[in-house]
Regions:
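Charge-rich, low-complexity N-terminal segments
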Residues: 1-145
Length: 145
């Protein structure tokens, strides 16, 4: 019998959240210089698009690597419910210390999704704006800075 075929699955999800880019390690002037308008004391919002990529063997009975319903449920529970319409630095424990940059958001979402039991998480890509996107593929394990 031959090895099962492996396929990558990409799926997109959306949520809205606000954040303020501000580092306690920097002075007010440094924060303003580095983060610009993203350092607004009142924060600002984004409509994020998150693409997750999983890989796995095609199940011979279903012809799929995983059930999309199972994947959607997992992502909704671990990501959408946790981040949608939230102030990241005020309501998400991971960002009480770490600056809620989209780079750090990629890592946090990757960590929340890597335990999906039916496929292997390959990468998380986040579109913050039409000009800015970030991707994390889990190559460098560790916690948020």
């Amino acid at each position: 019998m031959s090895d099962p075929l492996h396929v990558e699955l990409g799926r997109r999800y959306r949520f809205a959240a606000s954040h303020r880019l501000h580092s306690a390690q920097l002075s007010e002037m440094e924060n303003a210089r580095i983060y610009g308008k993203c350092n607004n004391p009142y924060g600002h919002g984004h409509n994020y698009t998150v693409e997750v990529r999983f890989s796995g063997a095609i199940d011979p009975d279903t012809g799929m690597i995983t059930s999309l319903a199972d994947l959607d449920s997992f992502v909704n529970e671990r990501v959408i419910e946790a981040f949608d319409h939230r102030s990241l630095q005020d309501e998400v424990p991971a960002f009480r210390e770490a600056v809620p940059t989209t780079e750090n958001l990629c890592i946090e979402i990757f960590q929340r999704l890597r335990s999906f039991p039916r496929a292997t998480l390959e990468a998380v890509r986040i579109e913050e704006t039409s000009n800015n996107s970030f991707e994390y593929a889990g190559k460098h394990e560790g916690m948020l800075p």
